[in-house]
Regions:
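Catalytic cores of carbohydrate-active enzymes
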Residues: 228-230, 242, 255-261
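Non-catalytic accessory regions flanking glycosidase/transglycosidase catalytic cores in CAZymes
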Residues: 23-185, 194-195, 200-237, 249-254, ...
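Active-site neighborhood of divalent metal-dependent phosphoester/pyrophosphate hydrolases
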Residues: 189-191
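Active-site rim elements
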Residues: 327-335, 378-391
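Bacterial N-terminal signal peptides
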Residues: 10-20
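Acidic/histidine-rich catalytic cores of soluble enzymes
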Residues: 196, 258, 264
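Bacterial N-terminal signal peptides that target proteins for export
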Residues: 1-9
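Catalytic-core region of carbohydrate-active enzymes that cleave or remodel glycosidic bonds
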Residues: 265-370, 403
């Protein structure tokens, strides 16, 4: 598969665009790339006021859809395959330092640390400490959890009390002995509503396990250090909100955040139907509480996306180490970055407080012997085992990085209204008085967008980023440059921007 990204061809493509743009006296775009001392001509943002626009993005700074946002981040689990070299660990850290994830979900299996009922605390600890040390040193909020293997027996309707005690003891070890107070939330049993889960969709069995575990955690004083993240269900429709409402009823003190997982189809998100689905779960959560997207990714299951589904299977079948059952092969395409942005924007505007992308690295999980789940931003064992091209950062890393590093923990999001055309979504937030606005165009056509606000005020010293194929330049292994800096915006008058097809623009004072 041809791999897009950091090639000289990509850079030359951008320079060609810049050259053609500099000749256009009407300044039809603003794709200039600044160097260390000055910006190249053509890096201005707004197109002339007289140019017609397709839609209006209106920001209401007097109204908020989500406050004190936890942040966006990634699923980062202890690696199941091979040992990682010091060089690769440093590469992982450097890439994450550019992304700046605010929120990480991290899962394990307590059964792998239990021998004849006894907890072996050091089992697998070396790998896990690499992850937790990083999160602790960067102040990242961690949602830790157990996949659920052997914790419950759905045939007998029983729970494994030994394993549940060991989970509480292991958490006590990590938090109180090892000092990992970055762990703020705990997930018990991944996606308990699913037929693939250890509880096979039995709410009563899951709640029995949670009650027993939480009592064991309380005995150790852990209730003062962590809260539950629940119910952690995977949903595709609005028909399973009872999992959230029952959690509100049964675990009002134990639950710190509500969480769900979504793997929507492209048409579901791009059409806006996704908002209606996820809003139902927000509405089912406790008033004043937070709810997060504990996993988010795309699966092309709707009839309208049959072409994407077929292409996904074809690509997986043509890659020797890819699982055809559980891979998202469009992570190699720029489109996946804009689709993920679309989903996140709708999630934020529906009142959620965080999103965790599935997943960081292909190398974390086998689906079957010799077959990996291809979902990540890269495969850190590419050079050693799978081919150097797979270790290279994939395009959607840059889109997701913008939505992590420029949406820091504690961001408040304003109400945003988009009118005039389909395919455009937007968010607007503020952190410590500094504003960020992002707009995504998921359509196959260029769109002209007017951004306006009666009460947001002017934006000063703005950096502008644009994500899309051929629209930005990277440096080194993973650094993305803004296309312009030190810009000013008068939103009371309105600013008009052009968004190429399948692109995202982010404007930030941060």
């Amino acid at each position: 598969m041809k791999h897009p990204g950091l090639s000289i061809i990509n850079i030359l493509t951008v320079l060609t665009v810049l050259t053609s743009c500099s000749c256009n006296q009407d300044r039809q775009n603003n794709w200039g790339i600044p160097d260390k001392e000055q910006e190249l001509p053509g890096s201005e943002t707004a197109v002339p006021e007289e140019i017609a626009y397709d839609c209006t993005v209106t920001v209401d700074a007097s109204s908020f859809v989500s406050e004190d946002y936890i942040g966006n981040g990634v699923q980062w689990d202890p690696y199941e395959v091979n040992d990682i070299s010091d060089t690769d660990w440093q590469k992982l850290y450097n890439r994450l330092d550019f992304m700046k994830p605010q929120f990480i979900r991290m899962m394990h299996n307590i059964g792998e640390k239990t021998v004849n009922g006894a907890l072996i605390k050091e089992a697998g600890l070396e790998h896990l400490m690499h992850l937790l040390d990083y999160c602790q040193s960067r102040g990242i909020t961690v949602m830790f959890g157990d996949w659920g293997g052997s914790i419950a027996d759905p045939e007998k309707g029983t729970i494994n009390e030994t394993l549940l005690r060991n989970i509480a003891e292991y958490l006590d070890f990590l938090i109180n002995t090892k000092g990992y107070d970055c762990i703020k939330y705990y997930n018990l049993i991944n996606e308990p509503n699913g037929y693939w889960s250890q509880t096979k969709g039995d709410y009563d069995l899951w709640s029995h396990a949670v009650k027993f575990f939480w009592e064991e955690a309380r005995k150790l004083g852990l209730d003062k250090k962590i809260k539950m993240a629940a119910p952690d269900v995977a949903i595709w429709t609005a028909e399973e909100t009872f999992w959230v409402s029952n959690t509100v009823r049964d675990f009002p003190e134990a639950t710190g955040i509500y969480d769900i997982h979504t793997y929507p189809s492209k048409i579901t998100v791009n059409s806006g139907q996704y908002t209606d689905i996820i809003k139902a779960y927000k509405d089912a959560s406790a008033p004043g509480s937070k709810i997060v997207m504990g996993e988010i990714g795309f699966k092309y299951q709707e009839p309208e996306d049959a072409g994407y589904h077929a292409e996904n299977l074809k690509r997986a079948a043509n890659l020797a180490h890819a699982s055809t059952e559980d891979s998202q092969m469009f992570v190699y395409d720029y489109m996946y970055g804009t689709d993920m942005a679309d989903a996140v924007f709708q999630t934020i505007n529906a009142g959620y407080s965080g999103c965790v992308a599935w997943m960081l690295d292909d190398a974390m999980h086998y689906k079957e012997p010799g077959k990996l789940k291809i979902w990540g931003f890269w495969n850190i064992f590419g050079d050693e085992r799978y081919g150097a091209e797979h270790e290279t950062v994939r395009p959607w890393f840059y889109a997701w990085s913008l939505l992590c590093r420029y949406i820091p923990k504690g961001t408040d999001f304003y109400t945003v209204n988009v009118s005039g055309t389909d395919g455009i979504k937007a968010i607007a937030g503020v952190h410590d008085g500094k504003r960020t606005i992002a707009v995504v165009n998921v359509s196959k056509e260029e769109k002209t967008v007017k951004i306006t606000s009666d009460n947001l005020g002017n934006m000063d010293n703005v950096r502008k980023y644009i994500y899309g194929e051929g629209l930005f330049v990277t440096e080194g292994d993973c650094t993305m440059h803004p296309v312009a800096t030190d810009m000013d915006f008068s939103l009371s008058k309105g600013e008009i921007l052009k968004l190429p097809a399948e692109s995202m623009i982010l404007l930030t004072e941060l």
